Regions:
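Hydrophobic anchor residue at the start of the ABC signature
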Residues: 150
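Conserved beta-strand-loop-alpha-helix hinge in the C-terminal portion
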Residues: 216-245
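Catalytic Walker B motif of ABC-type/P-loop ATPase nucleotide-binding domains
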Residues: 161-164
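Conserved ABC ATPase signature
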Residues: 136-140
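Helix-to-loop junction immediately C-terminal to a conserved catalytic motif
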Residues: 54
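ABC ATPase NBD coupling module
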Residues: 73-87
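Q-loop/switch helix immediately C-terminal to the Walker
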Residues: 92, 98-114
């Protein structure tokens, strides 16, 4: 097989936001199919280096980078451009937990040229024979999740494979299998690989070179491929710290299925980008609006508003007594208009924004903290576009539909309450007076337009606030609670402001 040309890094310097120089004047070449093992003490910049090579270093965080990266497709100025050649297998795997095991790979394959994914299909199939494509990734073992992550990265067809602590949490057997798999993949595909690891035993034998990132000199220097020599070099850079040893866990890779029984080898029709967008749209429509709990939540809130408006409107208005019957028609007319144009839309928007802001912030916060958004970027998937567009469209459609449903629920309870207060009266009498101010078709269209404007503006501003908060969150699961609180406060505050301003303009 024809191997790809060498990848070359020239004059690379990396300075952390704290001012610490992690790399200074690095020049490095990586041959096709070569496996490099990068070692060094914690905090020396190993993970920063591979995040730079895969285009995921946060430039807005104050990092200073200089250098060039030459690859088969051209040259990248790392001072101003993100690298697009590195495919990263994340330490926590960063699998998409809302997709099945099969969909995690299929979404990548469907966004790549058919020829590229076809050439890699056989290799991927042999790695995953014991995994049911339909099973949730949460049901996969640690070893299975690792193999899914590697297979998914392979399907994106990167020029350079990058592994961040790939054997963390694996037992000896699983680690050895992983090392052999990486070595074989590099030989067969001609793709070079850079591995960052603290647990060295299984990777020493497969590495073509071992490079030590020395924080004292900010250089990357080659050391002998020998455990004792590597340990001595690491101890010299960080005196008093013992070298890491492999962790043991009871996680083993499953045996590969026979080709005839392997579900991953069956050809599947390609799905379009429109199909994947509709899949995310369906997911968020259900999550934000169509779930039974949501429907019950809105129905209950609207039913209470309908009851309270009629009950207190007739029993506790300023006239009371016998005037309740005398002023019945005018009171019912005003209450019907109030319910339709103000009370129900306002109450429903508050309920929707509060609930959905929490859901959106939690969902995106978990995606960010679980590295799923970064994985989408690294795999060249338009995931952010799919998710943001699906959420915003769901908010508009769902809010309008649920406000309409809420009006129906409020009308029903208001009718039942009225029938209790005025027994023996025909329902036609309620209908005639309740909707009297809405009888003029021209005014009705205008008034409903104002209602729709309030609903859509509340949904977009509330949801947009939750989106911004969720996507800009720190990569920490512990901060999700704060995200939710901030999203609810921001969304509800904007909803109150929107309704106040638009009601003043309307009336």
């Amino acid at each position: 097989m024809t191997r790809r040309p060498t990848i070359a890094i020239a004059d690379l310097s990396i300075v952390a936001p704290t001012g610490v120089k992690l790399v200074a004047g690095l020049t490095l070449s990586v041959d096709a199919g070569e496996v490099l093992l990068v070692v060094g003490p914690s905090g020396s910049g190993k993970t920063t280096l591979i995040r730079l090579l895969c285009g995921l270093l946060d430039r807005a965080g104050g990092w200073q980078v200089r250098g060039t990266l030459t690859h088969p497709g051209g040259q990248i100025d790392l001072a101003h451009q993100d690298s697009t050649i590195g495919g990263l297998v994340f330490q926590n795997h960063a699998l998409f937990d809302d997709l099945s095991a099969g969909e995690n790979l299929r979404i990548v394959a469907d966004h790549r040229p058919a020829a590229a994914t076809f050439q890699l299909a056989a290799t991927v199939g042999t790695m995953l024979g014991d995994i049911d494509p339909a099973q949730p990734v949460s049901a996969c073992s640690g070893g299975q999740r690792q193999r899914l992550a590697i297979a998914r990265t392979l399907l994106s067809d990167p020029v350079l494979l990058l592994f961040d602590e790939p054997n963390a949490g694996l037992d000896i057997r699983a680690s050895r299998w992983l090392a052999e798999t990486i070595r074989e993949l590099c030989r067969e595909s001609g793709k070079p690989a850079i591995i960052v690891a603290h647990h060295l035993d299984d990777f020493i034998t497969l590495a073509d070179r071992v490079l030590l990132l020395d924080p004292a000199t900010a250089t990357l220097r080659e050391v002998p491929i020998d455990r004792s020599a590597i340990e001595a070099a690491m101890l010299a850079t960080e005196p008093g710290v013992a070298a890491a040893t492999p962790e043991l866990e009871r996680t083993t890779p499953g045996a590969a299925a026979s080709p005839a029984a392997n579900p991953w080898t069956r050809p599947l029709p390609r799905r379009s980008r429109a199909w994947w967008f509709l899949r995310y749209l369906r997911e968020y429509l259900w999550l934000l609006f169509a779930a039974p709990s949501m429907l019950l939540y809105i129905a209950l809130g609207s039913a209470i508003v309908g009851f309270v408006t009629i009950w207190f409107g007739f029993n506790y208005h300023s006239f009371g007594g016998y005037l309740r019957a005398v002023l019945h028609d005018e009171t019912l007319e005003g209450l019907g208009f109030l319910l339709t144009m103000v009370a129900v839309p306002f109450n429903t928007c508050l309920l929707l924004v509060a609930r959905n802001s929490a859901i959106i912030a939690a969902d995106l916060g978990n995606r960010v903290s679980g590295m799923q958004m970064q994985a989408m970027k690294n795999l060249h998937l338009p995931g952010r576009g799919y998710i943001v567009a699906s959420i915003l469209i769901s908010l508009v459609i769902g809010s309008l539909v649920l406000v309409a449903a809420a009006l129906v629920a409020a009308f029903c309870t208001s009718l039942l309450t009225w029938m209790y207060l005025f027994p023996g009266q025909p329902t036609e009498y309620w209908q005639e007076n309740f909707f009297r101010k809405l009888a003029d078709r021209h005014e009705l269209v205008s008034d409903l337009g104002w209602v729709a404007l309030k609903v859509v503006a509340s949904a977009l501003l509330g949801g947009g606030t939750a989106l911004l908060i969720g996507l800009r969150s720190r990569r920490s699961a512990s901060g999700v609670t704060q995200l939710i609180a901030s999203a609810i406060i921001g969304g509800v505050s904007l909803t109150l402001l929107v309704h106040a301003v638009l009601m003043l303009l309307q009336f």
